[in-house]
Amino acid sequence: MATQRVLPQSKETLLQSYNKRLKDDIKSILENFTEIIKTAKIEDETQVSRPAQAEQDHYEMHVRAANIVRAGESLMKLVSDLKQFLILNDFPSVNDAISLQNQQLRSLQEECDKKLISLRDEIAIDLYELEEEYYSSSYSQWDTDLPLCEAYHRVDNWASPSSSSSSTQGDQEEVEILPSQETEPQHHLNGQGTSSLEKM
């Protein structure tokens, strides 16, 4: 059996005032409604004339109806005050709601972790099968220490002879240009070449 929480004195006094307001408003509504019903009853002849009595009853009904409306508005205000009191002071309920949300988030996190671990294991198995297939295929002529991406890159370069031949041809042209530049006669700054040497 849950133990009853002990409220501070200020909160206890506030709750007692709420309870008193509730009882007073309900009592006011009940009494005024009962008097309206009594006033609507047609009485026997009295010393007051019927027009005066009707006017008096009409005024009394208006007053008591206004009292009922005022008591109803007071009850609505009381409901609003109670909601505010519960929101600001009902810490156990707030803590329970936070704990429940934390449990839901933890369960969702555990589920996501399990899915990620399962996905990691599946990827590892597929990668192992791909490596086995690679090393047992024709690509195994390359260095087995190379990663798969670098080995495939080398195979692509080897499979395109046009690019490799053009690159080797460009290298040969550069090699041919360099010796030709070295065999050309060097001219002096004064414009005299080998002819000046022959004259000497």
From Swiss-Prot:
Residue segments, region Disordered = 159-200
Provide the family line: Belongs to the Mediator complex subunit 22 family.
Q: Does the keyword tRNA processing apply?
A: no
Top-level taxon of the source organism: Eukaryota
Q: What is this protein called?
A: Mediator of RNA polymerase II transcription subunit 22
Which cellular compartments is it found in?
Nucleus
Task: Tell me which species this is from.
Answer: Takifugu rubripes (Japanese pufferfish)
Task: Tell me one GO biological process term.
Answer: regulation of transcription by RNA polymerase II
Complex and partners: Component of the Mediator complex.
